[in-house]
């Protein structure tokens, strides 16, 4: 019987060793699997943090661009008005004794035309008033009159020009309206 025990013991011992090896191998596999998933999670977290930082940088850049756009929005118009300013300065620097009323009026007319060109180019348009039906969106009635030459509700006189910039009223025309 002791021989039987000896014979059985090596087999049992081998089985225990195999079981221990399998257990150890399974533990190693789980550890490797856990390490793999931990690395994946860290990589995803790092990617998420970089994306969040990129989004914040984008927000800052867009905010800065919007501020700059608002700050320098009128730069183009200012650049176009500079030659007009130069012409006024030249007129003021001209010899006053040799200047005639006619030459002064000619110079002012030239500057006026130059200014109108700049405004036209930018989209500023005078609002039609006299003889037009009164429109509260573009006209501001400051006086009323009774003139048989005009129909009721028609603008008789323009007291101050009104202007539209593209599709917005910048200043309504001040008008006298027929009752």
UniProtKB/Swiss-Prot annotation:
One of its GO terms (cellular component) is cytoplasm. Keywords: Chaperone, Cytoplasm, Stress response. Homodimer. The keyword Oxidoreductase does not apply. This is Protein GrpE. Gene3D superfamilies: 3.90.20.20, Head domain of nucleotide exchange factor GrpE. One of its GO terms (molecular function) is unfolded protein binding. GO terms for biological process: protein folding. PANTHER family: GRPE PROTEIN, GRPE PROTEIN HOMOLOG, MITOCHONDRIAL. It comes from the Bacteria. Pfam families: GrpE. Residues 33-45 have a biased composition (Basic and acidic residues). HAMAP family: GrpE. NCBIfam families: PRK14140.1 (NF010738). The keyword Membrane does not apply. Its main location: cytoplasm. Residues 1-45 are annotated as: Disordered.
